[in-house]
Amino acid sequence: MNPVTRAKLDLIIAVTAFGTIGIFVRYIALPSSIIALVRGAVGAAFLWLLLRWKKTPFQREALRPHLKLLVLSGVIMSFNWITLFEAYNYTTVATATLCYYMAPVFVTLASPFLFHERLTARKLLCILTALCGMVFVSGVPQSGLPQAGEAKGILLALCSAVFYAGDISINKILDRVPTYERTMVQLAVAAVIMVPYILLTVDTSALTLTPLGAILLVIGGVFHT
């Protein structure tokens, strides 16, 4: 497979994973924080096994100088997941996903301050178009302001987009850190961050998991992460 075809295939897989996570989460009868914890733990474990299978050494020294940013990225990732999964409980998967797609807009707006990139007229036009689309997705032009539950879902999805934009920005700074190791640390940190939050907010004794839910959790941790 030539590099161009491989790149296109990778992009298709990434977009498919990115756009279908909400459908899977809908059918997992667990709190969003539990799903986020399992997703991080399973994802980190899968990458570790992948490195072992490929007989690739874990590059600790490459991570050491960037450890603080990696930890921060993992923390942001955990809040990104929680807010997105919570959004699915208040609005439709389609609406939450479209709001989540505002993340590149936030990255573009922050780029002049973080990366000294020029905010061109073309970029501003794209941002304006995205914002107009966001207004139409919210349903305001057709039915006025959304109901409280729907509005909460939209706001949670937008908060998730902000967190995701922060994660994208940090990963741009960490672009020279090996991909597998970087992602593994970020996922592990996100999972660890979720533990105290779950202990404080979730009655774990009342949790139940169906076989279908367990399968979807594993798929979410491996494919969607």
Sequence positions of predicted segments:
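Specific transmembrane alpha-helical segments of multi-pass solute transporters/efflux pumps
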Residues: 55-95, 100, 136, 221-225
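Hydrophobic transmembrane alpha-helices of multi-pass small-molecule transport proteins
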Residues: 47, 51, 71, 119-141, ...
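Specific alpha-helical transmembrane segments that line the substrate/conduction pathway
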Residues: 34-37, 41-45, 85-118, 160
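Glycine-/small-residue-enriched transmembrane alpha-helix faces in small-molecule transporters
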Residues: 1-45, 75, 83, 146-173, ...
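Cytoplasmic-side transmembrane-helix entry/capping segments in multi-pass membrane proteins
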Residues: 8, 65-71, 119-131, 153-154, ...
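Membrane-interface helix-cap regions at the ends of transmembrane helices
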Residues: 23, 44-63, 132-148, 189-213
